[in-house]
């Protein structure tokens, strides 16, 4: 998925109606590049408060296993409250970016961060890509866009909770730009903080998550 460089622009309209243009660049990692894999034709755009159908469609594209990895519990459906929470975006404290297949004009992934009110430079982050599009670079594109927007609005630290068995999340974290702080690790959940910055090689990450927890 890192065999090409994808560029584009995502425009955010804030609550003060100021339009912000954010360039998106997905850079290849020298250890991960695979020239035989093309980054697909995907448009990125900000998720809007009225995009509950798009959020529902991405959720519907996740199998039971993917849902458990994303939500860390069995999640057969999204409730009305879930949808309200997931679409309560303001492009500053709650930012979400939607990936849409250009050919099919259908949502295929979403990445978001929600700022910590007690620590304004920190935000919780989550990424979901429908099963049919996993492993094709969509998560990487979404994460790159999310990092750029975070830096624009003063977020310097991402926190995340994930299953140690979530290979896609491990790959994204392995290539993420910045320094990783390990917060907690047990059989079910791994919690990390990512201080945003330049990419840092971290071969220890896979070894850490693969080892038995005592």
Which residues does each predicted region cover?
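Short, Lys/Arg-enriched N-terminal segments with co-localized hydrophobic residues
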Residues: 4-21
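Long, contiguous binding/interaction regions
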Residues: 17-214
